């Protein structure tokens, strides 16, 4: 639904008022305190002061006011407004809970540039530092202006928003950690507020969820005890907490995987957990072959690099069934017939998903070779291929499925929940046969 001008104008005015109110109130409250510290690196004293950079610094106001008018749908406008609102409120809370001020004296500047500095510094104070709300907002704005421009205009837009980011340092408005915090805040807001959120089915595994939750709680205790630089542990702590929620029932949708790829906001938000998954893949890939043939036209294997995927395509793979939620698919595989049914690691597919997997494998194996994979090519892949073997009649029982899979892929590990799902499917297939 197109955005009415009045709606865009209301959003622009409302967001501007929210920013001015929260930012100004936090500045004023902090100015009344005597316990305001600083946070910076020693080498930041050598960052030059560049007066002309006040122009890109102040230009963000114009882009901010104009952004809602670029939105082409109510959903896009609502998502933008939610991100900006959340960033302002979260940043405001941080300004009050962890007040900081700029550590250095800001040089006096003459001429018309000096007049600009005098004007905006008359309304500003050296507080509201971490996270940099200026950085968070320019990240939202940069994304929306890039979406609605192209060619040389987009290049100019991206360049200007890069200058806005740099200007926060070169005008002595922020320290380096403020910028890191601002980008982090923007990443969390991008991750949390999506235009299209899909609820994916999940079979919960509370035991794994508790492991992640315990890890998050341990990090929280460390942060509360040691403070200061231990706040950096918020990153893995939040990551563990979100993944714990996935295993308790939120499901694989936490990875936001779309068209076979994880967005950058997921890489940031869940980075520590994704790093753990990557290290796990590197370890297990030494324990097994890349892929094995289970039946004519059906291969089972692990997540492949783009080079390995290209080799598989040259070897005859024409379709891919990707069961991972936590990895981006290789470009070579996304270029052929690609289907993603995201299943959380260490969980089993639902019965509906097993039927969907079996149907895809059956259809694609008649046209060429279908490559079925999860992270390592073990339990999730075994469930998918097992569903196909049972549904097609190539195996008469779950025990036959297990025997065949272990014969062709000796290192395979099939988790109890995957076996239980296959047994449930087998019962349903038998009942369907008897009733027909």
Residue ranges of model-derived segments:
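Membrane-interface helix-boundary motifs at transmembrane edges
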Residues: 3-7, 69-81, 147-152, 199-204, ...
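PTP/DSP superfamily signal
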Residues: 197-282, 289, 311, 358-369, ...
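Aromatic-anchored segments of alpha-helical transmembrane domains
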Residues: 20-21, 89-96, 159-171, 216-223, ...
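N-terminal transmembrane-helix/juxtamembrane module of multi-pass inner/ER membrane proteins
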Residues: 1-63, 106-108, 117, 249-262, ...
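Cysteine-based protein phosphatase catalytic domain of the PTP/DSP
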Residues: 113-120, 282-372, 376, 387-430
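Membrane-embedded catalytic cores of phosphoryl/pyrophosphoryl-handling enzymes
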Residues: 118-206, 390-393, 399-409
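Structural signal for the C-terminal ends of transmembrane alpha-helices
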Residues: 67-75, 144-149, 189-197, 224-226, ...
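Membrane-interface loops
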Residues: 27-45, 70-165, 190, 320, ...
